């Protein structure tokens, strides 16, 4: 019952396609948020080698990437041991308006880094702004808050998908 890389990528891209067909801005915001996680970690580390106060913004960017990871992938809260206070704080962002504010606050912090020096952290600020904008559009148009429907294990109707879901359920 080994999952092939091809079947995993096929399931991811079919789930991504299904998400975009729903035309819900909260799903778009979630995907932009997931991309911003990778950008935060990569560009935060890349900019940490500046010999100026940009180092502070780089460290903040890395921390933002880790917090956004927990906001966008809440199953990690069950796996990693966190205090109940921190877990409840992260769970506050389970609606469109709170996520909009969260992303726009993160964007504002990274936009301030331009005052020190123009670096590649501008890309992170842009992605945070776009994610915040997507969640704002979802809230303004009264779209319900949705989470991505990607299932790496396959469709629930297939035997492979049912076994994969059972394994994941037992782990969590």
Swiss-Prot record:
Signal peptide positions (record): none
Keywords: Glycoprotein, Golgi apparatus, Membrane, Transmembrane, Transmembrane helix
Positions annotated with a glycan in the UniProt record: 24
Subcellular location: Golgi apparatus membrane
Pfam families for this protein: Cg6151-P
GO BP annotations listed: vesicle-mediated transport
Keyword Transmembrane: yes
Annotated transmembrane regions: 25-45, 48-68, 100-116, 123-140
Top-level taxon of origin: Eukaryota
Membrane topology: Multi-pass membrane protein
Keyword Membrane carried by entry: yes
GO cellular component, one term: Golgi membrane
Entry similarity comment: Belongs to the TVP18 family.
Record's function text: Golgi membrane protein involved in vesicular trafficking.
Name listed for the protein in its UniProt record: Golgi apparatus membrane protein TVP18
Gene designation per UniProt: TVP18
